[in-house]
């Protein structure tokens, strides 16, 4: 359900063999969904759907789709978002990234998502370091520093991060 069709209906329940698919298409990717003021409508919609059914699937977007090579420093929200969905009783997830090595840190994102979907409470920092050091070798710590600097700049800017943004959107946020 995108935007206008995302709200739970009143006076009707889905049949047991129906899955409700809720998409995070319009959400900000710079802050965790649970604590982002602009995402509270989505939080409420999940809660309202949970009153009607346990068959909820989240379709989440985790890369910059307009420009795959654009830095998209959202790695820090992946775990809290998965934890939010799990805590909300949602156990079906589709995390859409790029389908091959076209996007920024595709392999890293895939590795993190695989680990966190299996165990939402796993140590995300250890998972990231394990991948960076294993995949990039001696460059791993330098890439971790880059990732942390991008995250820090984005968080300190308090700016949004949308998956249909433009490369220049980061000029005042993560690329400062």
Description of each model-found segment:
Residues 1-129, 174:
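Catalytic-core regions of glycoside hydrolase
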Residues 4-5, 10, 89, 115-176:
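Catalytic domains of carbohydrate-active enzymes that cleave complex glycans
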């Amino acid at each position: 359900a995108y935007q206008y069709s995302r709200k739970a209906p009143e006076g009707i329940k889905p049949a047991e063999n129906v899955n409700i698919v809720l998409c995070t298409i319009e959400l900000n990717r710079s802050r965790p969904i649970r604590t982002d003021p602009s995402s509270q409508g989505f939080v409420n919609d999940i809660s309202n759907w949970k009153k009607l059914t346990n068959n909820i699937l989240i379709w989440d977007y985790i890369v910059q789709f307009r420009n795959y090579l654009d830095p998209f420093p959202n790695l820090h929200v992946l775990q809290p978002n998965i934890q939010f969905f799990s805590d909300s009783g949602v156990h079906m997830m589709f995390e859409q990234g790029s389908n091959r090595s076209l996007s920024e840190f595709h392999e890293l994102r895939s590795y993190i998502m695989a680990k966190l979907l299996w165990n939402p409470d796993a140590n995300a920092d250890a998972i990231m370091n394990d991948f960076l050091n294993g995949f990039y070798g001696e460059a791993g710590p330098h890439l971790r520093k880059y990732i942390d600097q991008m995250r820090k700049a984005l968080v300190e800017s308090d700016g949004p991060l949308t998956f249909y943004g433009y490369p220049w959107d980061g000029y005042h946020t993560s690329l400062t």
